[in-house]
A protein has these predicted regions:
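Catalytic core of non-heme Fe(II) oxygenases with the double-stranded beta-helix
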Residues: 88-221
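Non-heme Fe(II)/2-oxoglutarate
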Residues: 1-94, 117, 123, 132-135
Length: 221
């Protein structure tokens, strides 16, 4: 493990301006070419990458996340950053999965307290994320497949894991974790609000510089 899981509250300097920015951008869902082009499999809608839509905000957000790990270093990075919006009607749990990137970050922008992110570990070491599971996950999100058969497949897969950490989705909180960690959302809706769930999601593909990894340095003592 190179990146410890990390939670930071009051992350954005001006969350209201960030929310207003999201309202000015087009969101794309399962029927859009964008979704199929990148072979995406997620619930709800996303914007295009903010590196294209708003470069200054993209650099601000990604740099701010990396400063949580490397406060004194100048870091070069490659990352994807999106707004994601999930409708309040999406009253289903998500699929437990892994990301292919080095570091992931989720920033919660809406008032959903009960739809945070959870980390998991397999009950058996040989329960590995496979192409077959990934295809089922993507199909259920892409086709809005909420059938009993799809739910049974999701639950059968999710039941192979034990939850090791629940992070509530408090507004303006960022949660960072290694992409290889199994993670998921137990519920995309929350009893305290009927608004759509709005987040910023960031995937760091490459992080370079004169880096000392916190977990590695800790093990030297």
């Amino acid at each position: 493990m190179l990146f410890p899981s990390l939670v930071q509250d009051d992350f954005l300097n001006d969350i209201e301006s960030v929310i207003e920015l999201s309202k000015k951008l087009p969101f794309k869902g399962p029927t859009d070419d964008f979704f199929n082009k990148i072979n995406g499999g997620w619930p709800g809608e996303r914007t295009d990458c903010l590196s294209v839509l708003n470069t200054n905000f993209y650099i601000y957000f990604c740099s701010k996340v990396l400063k949580l790990y490397y406060p004194g270093e100048i870091i070069c990075f490659e990352a994807e950053l999106y707004f994601q919006r999930i409708p309040s009607t999406f009253n289903f749990p998500g699929w437990i999965h892994q990301d292919s990137n080095q570091l992931s970050a989720v920033c919660y922008l809406s008032n959903h307290k009960d739809s945070g992110t959870s980390l998991y570990k397999p009950k058996n070491f040989y329960n590995v994320y496979s192409d077959a599971i990934d295809k089922l996950k993507k199909k259920s999100y892409r086709d809005s497949d909420f059938s009993e058969e799809s739910a049974a497949a999701r639950d059968a897969w999710n039941n192979k894991f034990d939850c090791i950490l629940d992070v509530p989705s408090y507004r303006n909180r960022v949660f960072c974790f290694e992409g290889s960690k199994y993670h998921g959302v137990k519920n995309f809706t929350s009893e305290n609000t009927e608004d759509d769930r709005l987040t910023l999601i960031c995937f760091f593909q490459k992080i370079e510089g004169n880096i000392k990894y916190p977990a590695v340095e800790s093990r030297k003592i």
